[in-house]
Design a protein with these regions (language model features):
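N-terminal, polar/charged subdomain of small-to-medium soluble alpha/beta proteins
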Residues: 1-126
Length: 126
């Protein structure tokens, strides 16, 4: 049995990149997050919050981190998100996908994905 928490299409407020006059400036940055967690937090015997992984604090930390200052690259923000995921003992592995839109006039997305397996995430926790 495997279980995941999946967050899709979260538009985050952030300031990424430096653009010159005439360059396309993205209007949105979108985050997808897939967290592998123990099935014991999903396959539960009672309908109680203390039986599940409370992801709201993690989302709040991600939003705060994303909006706190300027980033030159999506990669740096993804790295910070990876460390935030590692702060949660319930998270076993993570798949983080951050993309921006548009990348050419009115079209296209460009994204960066980081997949962190159990061993790599454990290394971030220490």
């Amino acid at each position: 049995m495997k279980s995941y928490i999946e967050l899709k299409d979260l538009e985050i407020t952030t300031n990424i990149g430096t653009y010159q006059a005439g360059e396309v400036v993205p209007s949105a940055h979108i985050l997808d997050l897939r967290l592998t967690i123990s099935p014991r937090y999903v396959f539960i015997d009672e309908d109680l919050m203390e039986r599940v992984f409370d992801y709201d604090p993690l989302i709040a930390k991600i939003s705060k981190t994303a909006s706190n200052g300027h980033y030159e690259t999506q990669e740096r923000l993804i790295t910070k998100i990876a460390f935030l995921c590692a702060e949660n003992e319930e998270v076993i592995a993570a798949d983080i996908y951050l993309r921006k839109f548009p990348v050419s006039p009115e079209t296209g997305t460009l994204g960066v994905r980081l997949k962190i397996d159990q061993d790599d995430l454990q290394a971030l926790k220490t």
